[in-house]
């Protein structure tokens, strides 16, 4: 029939076109094969990366650099992803310090125990920092470059004198293995956590307000008396003594506040630069290079308590297996 003849004719022409344009058909096949190869390669690479990061927990410099490019999570906290790179950054600094400064063999029994310790510390720290950043965004809390600069500037003062920024950067690289940009990132995250901890801790703020009222109603109450009065009202407060320390001592800003005082004088409340609470200091003694002081501390507790509550409510999910140790920040 005419239809059968037409079909045969089309088949013959199609075959002719294939012989007439062989390069076109070959090119299409090459493109198709190339796409298949690329997809398979990507899948294989993804499986290898997944295996190395999660089951194997590879902490090498290569995978640390890789996680800075690929934003893969190591955990989630209250719906926020904890970056694997932040965990590895903290862990690498601790490992570098143990190897270079403490000369610890990480393959020894003691070294393996230390690794478990700093792994938990690094993971809990990364989780806490991420949760702090989440709250900071909600409350509009920001940290400026100047605040980071001020922290670094205060660290340039040493017992033997003030060092240069270059010497400080070289020391950070040698001791912890961090570049200046990496260390600035760590400082920025710690400042965010501190700012959030102070912002949300209504208990500590109430204790501070109560202490200020007690101070105003009495003539120079001793720190011991003030601490007991706060404790009797149900507030958390503790006292302590520094002993003789150099005036360049890095202790959360307590020495620097004590330097402003006369003997036996008590400061007003201030926030420690380590973000662990509100302090009063009383100067005990001072020389040209050293001083000693007593202090009263009202600790911050609500941030860590919120993390504990999240853990209890299964709102913290960890994607790698890390043992619980005494270093844990999040008490479970």
Residue positions per predicted region:
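Short, low-structural-confidence N-terminal segments
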Residues: 1-113, 253, 260-266, 275, ...
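N-terminal short leaders/motifs
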Residues: 12-34, 213-239
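Alpha-helical transmembrane segments of integral membrane proteins
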Residues: 32-36, 116, 120, 185
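N-terminal targeting/tethering segments
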Residues: 61-178, 182
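FKBP-type peptidyl-prolyl cis-trans isomerase
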Residues: 69-97, 136, 192-196, 226-231, ...
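Sec-exported extracytoplasmic/periplasmic mature domains
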Residues: 92-99, 123-142, 148, 153-164, ...
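Proteostasis/folding factors centered on peptidyl-prolyl cis-trans isomerases
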Residues: 169-198, 252-297
């Amino acid at each position: 029939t005419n239809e059968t003849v037409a079909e045969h004719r089309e088949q013959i022409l199609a075959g002719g076109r294939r012989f007439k344009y062989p390069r076109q058909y070959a090119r299409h096949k090459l493109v198709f094969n190339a796409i298949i190869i690329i997809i398979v390669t990507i899948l294989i690479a993804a499986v290898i990366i997944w295996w190395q990061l999660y089951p194997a927990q590879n902490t090498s410099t290569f995978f640390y650099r890789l996680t800075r490019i690929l934003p893969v999570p190591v955990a989630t906290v209250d719906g926020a992803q904890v970056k694997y790179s932040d965990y590895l950054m903290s862990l690498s600094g601790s490992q570098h310090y143990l190897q270079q400064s403490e000369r610890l063999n990480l393959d020894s029994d003691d070294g393996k125990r230390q690794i478990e310790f700093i792994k938990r510390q690094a993971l809990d720290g990364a989780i806490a920092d991420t949760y702090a950043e989440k709250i900071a965004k909600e409350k509009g809390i920001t940290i400026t470059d100047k605040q980071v600069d001020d922290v670094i500037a205060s660290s340039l003062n040493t017992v033997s004198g003030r060092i240069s920024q270059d010497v400080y950067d070289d020391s950070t690289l040698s001791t912890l293995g961090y570049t200046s940009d990496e260390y600035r990132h760590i400082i920025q995250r710690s400042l965010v956590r501190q700012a959030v901890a102070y912002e949300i801790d209504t208990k500590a703020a109430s204790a501070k307000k109560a202490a200020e009222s007690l101070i105003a109603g009495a003539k120079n109450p001793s720190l011991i008396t003030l601490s007991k009065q706060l404790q009797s009202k149900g507030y958390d407060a503790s006292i302590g003594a520094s002993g003789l320390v150099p005036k360049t001592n890095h202790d959360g800003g307590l020495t620097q506040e004590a330097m402003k005082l006369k003997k036996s004088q008590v400061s007003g409340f201030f926030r420690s630069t380590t973000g662990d609470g509100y302090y009063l200091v009383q100067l005990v003694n001072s020389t040209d290079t050293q001083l000693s002081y007593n202090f009263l501390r009202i600790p911050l507790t609500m941030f860590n308590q919120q993390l504990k509550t999240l853990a209890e409510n299964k709102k913290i999910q960890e994607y790698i297996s890390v043992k619980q140790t005494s270093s844990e920040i999040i008490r479970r």
